[in-house]
Amino acid sequence: QGVSGYSEFTVAAPESLIKIEKSYPIEMATLFGCAIMTGVGAVVNTAKVQPGTTTAVFGVGGVGLSVVLGLKLVGAYPIIAVDTLKNKLDLAKQAGATHLINASEVDPVSALRDLTGGGATDVFEAVGSEKALGQAYAATRKGGRTITVGLPSPESELRIPALSIVAEERQLLGSYMGSCVPKRDIPRFLELYREGRLQVDVLNSRFISLDQVNEGFDALDQGEVARQIIKFDI
């Protein structure tokens, strides 16, 4: 049975709940259960990115923006954001991206390899398509890592040069929910937010009422927003 997030009341198992301090803003805490945990967790738990690492993120929606926030947190440089939508790239810059590549205007792989002199060391894919994952892999330097957090359809298949994994000592890593332990990592990330080290506010495009939920889904589908928070008192 599913648990509804679009109702005034819901029933959840105790083991699915995370207790947080009252001092945390409850509205913003809603973002930590999925996007932040997945994106930031991929950086600090799965990949354990080191300061000064050359990085890139393919797809800067809610999860991709969270990856950017995580990369800024650990001191990666440069942080290259790749997307087809200008408004998403603008948000990525606010989140901490140092360079932007609009994939609707240029070949993102060629542009990224030119910018970095052969590819980035750690390249994250947060789109959920085999095309984006293939591009992310192609934009990774020799000896580098491609980390995928997107969820493609079960029928999708990825084709990459098999020899490159050995001959170029490449790594392809999967990260599910940021390799997080929720009871450990959600309070940890919330504290980083309270300290001002994790600029989560950039993810919230707007607050909406429960009656506006369908409009919210339309805006999300059109790529107009990163995340929206439903407030029941609007």
Predicted regions span which residues?
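C-terminal hydrophobic helical "lid"/dimerization subdomain
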Residues: 118, 122, 134-138, 179, ...
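Glycine- and other small-residue-rich loops at beta-strand/loop junctions that grip anionic moieties
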Residues: 9, 57-60, 81-82, 101, ...
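Phosphate-binding beta-alpha-beta segment of Rossmann-like dinucleotide-binding domains, i.e.
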Residues: 1-3
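Conserved donor sugar-nucleotide recognition element shared by glycan-biosynthetic enzymes
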Residues: 35, 129, 182-186
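Mid-domain Rossmann-like dinucleotide-binding core that forms the NAD(H)/NADP(H) cofactor-binding site
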Residues: 8, 15-16, 21-106, 110
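Glycine-rich cofactor phosphate-binding loops and adjacent beta1-alpha1 units
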Residues: 47-51, 63, 74, 84-86, ...
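Structural detector of well-ordered beta-strand residues that form the stable sheet scaffold
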Residues: 56, 80, 145-147, 173, ...
